[in-house]
Structure formats: C-alpha cells, structure tokens
C-alpha cells in the first residue's frame, strides 16, 4: 500500500498495540520477573491486571516490557523532573556600583547588599566608576576595592580583580565561598 499515512507517536515508550516485537521479557506490576513470553500473552496479562504493557528498553534482546499504569508512570516522571528543576539554582551576577568618594554610610549599605547577594549564592560584580578629575586618583579606587575584598574575605573569593583601570571603571567579580 503506497502513500499511506503513518501516525507518528510522540511518546518515548511504546505501549500496548504499538509494541512490534514477537517476544518480550515481561516484568509484572510489582516489579517481579515473569520471563520471556509472546507479545500476545503479555498483552493478555496486562489486560487481566487492568493496566498497560509498556516497552521499557526496546533495544534489549528480547525487548523489556513492564505491566503498569501508564498514566501514573507519566505523572510520576513529570513530578520527578519538576523536583529536579526546582533543585537547580540559577546563579545570577548582581552588580553593586561604588565611586571613589563613596561615604562610610553608603559604603556600609552597599556592603550589606553584597553580603546578602553572596549568602543567597549569587555572584557579585563590584563596579568602581570614576568621573572627571577622579581619574587622576586611581589609587583611591584600588584602596576601596582592597577594602571591599578584605571585608568580604570570609564570605567570598575574588574571581577577577582589576590590575588597571578599564575605560572609566574598575570591575571586581566575587563568587560565594562553598560551605
């Protein structure tokens, strides 16, 4: 029969009538090994149990099939995937901007923000921006970056520290220390 359309299944596992093997290695509802049986016999056992016959590993010889509730199997699988996704933490880079003339009060507020970011597990980018005549006093900027590094020594490790000024700013990247 030419030109016939085949419906392509989007499922990862073949179930019931989609299984093409003549013989299968069958596993029961509770995970007990039943052995190698014909496909017809396996389908009958699945029907008796009121469940589906699901092909677990199609590349094995003979293919391994399990009697199970396929809907429940998909639900459990999606649930575990969601749990794994929740556990993955996306590390963000948070930026805090300083100036060479940042006063003590502002410095403490910005330092508190840096501490909060690092405790949350995010990386912190410290940007020190120079304007106008401040460019002539780059050593003040280096002193400030060194002070920040010393104040956050027990919380963070320095990933990149500027040796010289880049354009009109110095950038230091801090990563939280592993506990």
Curated annotation (Swiss-Prot):
The keyword Cytoplasm applies. It holds the Pfam family IF3_C. The gene is infC. InterPro entries: T_IF-3_C_sf, T_IF-3_N_sf, Translation_initiation_fac3_CS, Translation_initiation_fac_3, Translation_initiation_fac_3_C, Translation_initiation_fac_3_N. One of its GO terms (biological process) is ribosome disassembly. HAMAP family: IF_3 (MF_00080). The keyword Acyltransferase does not apply. Monomer. This is Translation initiation factor IF-3. Keywords: Cytoplasm, Initiation factor, Protein biosynthesis. Belongs to the IF-3 family. It comes from the Bacteria. It is found in: Cytoplasm. PROSITE patterns: IF3. IF-3 binds to the 30S ribosomal subunit and shifts the equilibrium between 70S ribosomes and their 50S and 30S subunits in favor of the free subunits, thus enhancing the availability of 30S subunits on which protein synthesis initiation begins. One of its GO terms (cellular component) is cytosol. One of its GO terms (molecular function) is translation initiation factor activity. Gene3D superfamilies: Translation initiation factor 3 (IF-3), C-terminal domain, Translation initiation factor 3 (IF-3), N-terminal domain.
